[in-house]
């Protein structure tokens, strides 16, 4: 009897199972990378909005009062909130700036800073 050349069905199925396992791992890795990039992008733009609001306070520290508003950046609307914080002495004024992606949502970034009184 002549021997036939080629792969058996079992060999093909084993190879396919190995390939499928590897492909699933690659897909999960790429998906996680995309999620991380989106998260870092959101944090970066929120930090830029915080920087803008902190600069406004630094330019005019006498007008430090609780307020909130919105700002356009990177084609999105960011909602910020400025909150004065009491300090132990009168040498410094403290304030928090929080930025969220939706009004009333949990802030993406919150930063505390100080200005001279």
Curated annotation (Swiss-Prot):
Record's GO cellular component terms: plasma membrane; type II protein secretion system complex
Chain segments annotated as transmembrane: 7-27
Cell location: Cell inner membrane
Superkingdom, natural source: Bacteria
Keyword field: Cell inner membrane, Cell membrane, Membrane, Methylation, Protein transport, Transmembrane, Transmembrane helix, Transport
Membrane topology of this protein: Single-pass membrane protein
Post-translational modification: Cleaved by prepilin peptidase. Methylated by prepilin peptidase at the amino group of the N-terminal phenylalanine once the leader sequence is cleaved by prepilin peptidase.
Disulfide bond annotation, renumbered to this chain: none
Membrane is among the record's keywords: yes
GO annotation, biological process: protein secretion by the type II secretion system
Major location (coarse): membrane
Sites bearing N-methylphenylalanine, chain numbering: 7
Propeptide: 1-6
NCBIfam families found in the cross-reference section: gspI (TIGR01707), IV_pilin_GFxxxE (TIGR02532)
Family: Belongs to the GSP I family.
Role: Component of the type II secretion system required for the energy-dependent secretion of extracellular factors such as proteases and toxins from the periplasm. Part of the pseudopilus tip complex that is critical for the recognition and binding of secretion substrates.
Subunit text: Type II secretion is composed of four main components: the outer membrane complex, the inner membrane complex, the cytoplasmic secretion ATPase and the periplasm-spanning pseudopilus. Interacts with core component EpsG.
Name of protein: Type II secretion system protein I
Species: Vibrio cholerae serotype O1 (strain ATCC 39315 / El Tor Inaba N16961)
């Amino acid at each position: 009897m002549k021997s036939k050349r080629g792969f058996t069905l079992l060999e093909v199925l084993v190879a396919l199972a190995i390939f499928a396992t590897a492909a699933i791992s690659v897909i999960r890795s790429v998906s996680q990378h995309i999620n991380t990039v989106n998260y870092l992008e959101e944090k970066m733009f929120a930090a830029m909005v915080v920087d803008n609001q902190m600069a406004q306070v630094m330019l005019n520290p006498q007008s430090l009062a609780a307020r909130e508003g919105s700002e356009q950046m990177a084609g999105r609307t960011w909602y910020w909130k400025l909150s004065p914080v009491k300090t132990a002495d009168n040498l410094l004024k403290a304030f928090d700036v929080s930025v969220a992606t939706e009004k009333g949502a949990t802030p993406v970034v919150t930063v505390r800073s100080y200005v001279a009184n």
